[in-house]
Design a protein with these regions (language model features):
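Cap/lid segment of the alpha/beta-hydrolase catalytic domain
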Residues: 85-143, 193-203
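Hydrolase active-site cap/lid region
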Residues: 166, 170-219
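Active-site loop->helix "elbow" adjoining a glycine-rich segment at hydrolase catalytic centers
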Residues: 131, 163-167
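N-terminal targeting or regulatory segments adjacent to alpha/beta-hydrolase or S9 domains
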Residues: 1-45
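Alpha/beta-hydrolase fold nucleophile elbow
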Residues: 151-162
Length: 224
């Protein structure tokens, strides 16, 4: 692993772009709606379905597990893999922590409301409207939510996720300094130039969409 070299190739306006995105997110009233789901609740924790508004006014959803015993608890926020089916936290164990499992826009619990088609290619010709701009902001809104809850110990908010969830974990931890730790594994959506040279998928989908949109590969990479 020490021999792997991947030069930095971020755009000059990278941080300005994400700072503006965070500013726009902060202007969206979250309108949290928290509904107990009795069939998912158990002996140790209650499980709730949460709805909230994210960047661009998009409604996103997730499952929130809270120990029945009163107290302040650390929170683990889980970001899901690409097209993964949303699972609920186990309500009969892990009484030492809260858990929030987020479905980003168009995926998981939000699949019935998906307007993005092939998520990772949506808006590929315009970084302002690219799918993962909003999806990355969804990860921050999830952190906003857990920190808004009285049961949360604000000193101990942890992020984790694999594949797409690993990428979302890295993005959220980079953009939000309120978190205490992050555990990404097999992260997807990174180092695209090398990635697409090594394996066919999903580069073949991106290349086909670039042709469909009439943009060059370099323009595509600038969005990514």
């Amino acid at each position: 692993p020490d021999d792997i070299v991947s030069p930095k190739d971020g755009a000059e306006d990278l941080w300005a772009f994400w700072e503006q995105s965070l500013k726009e997110l902060a202007e969206v009233e979250p309108e949290y709606k928290i509904t107990l789901v009795p069939k998912l609740s158990g002996s140790v924790r209650d499980v709730y379905e949460v709805e909230m508004k994210s960047w661009g006014g998009e409604t996103i959803r997730g499952y929130w597990a809270v120990p029945k015993a009163q107290g302040k608890y650390p929170v683990v926020v889980t970001y899901m893999g690409y097209a993964a089916r949303t699972w609920a936290p186990n309500a009969n164990r892990n009484g030492d922590r809260c858990e929030f499992i987020l479905s980003i826009r168009g995926q998981g619990l939000n699949t019935p409301y998906n307007t993005y088609g092939e998520w990772m290619c949506y808006g590929l010709d315009n970084k302002a409207h690219y799918y993962y701009r909003g999806a990355f902001m969804d990860t921050i809104r999830a952190i906003d939510f857990v920190l808004s809850q009285d049961v949360t110990d604000p000193r101990c908010v942890l992020l984790e996720g694999g594949s797409q969830g690993g990428a979302l974990t890295l993005a959220a931890a980079s953009l939000d300094k309120r978190v205490a730790g992050a555990a990404p594994y097999v992260p997807f959506l990174g180092d695209f130039r090398d990635y697409f040279e090594i394996v066919d998928w999903p580069g073949n989908k991106f290349f086909a969409e670039a042709i469909n949109l009439g943009i060059s590969r370099e323009q595509m990479y600038q969005t990514l």
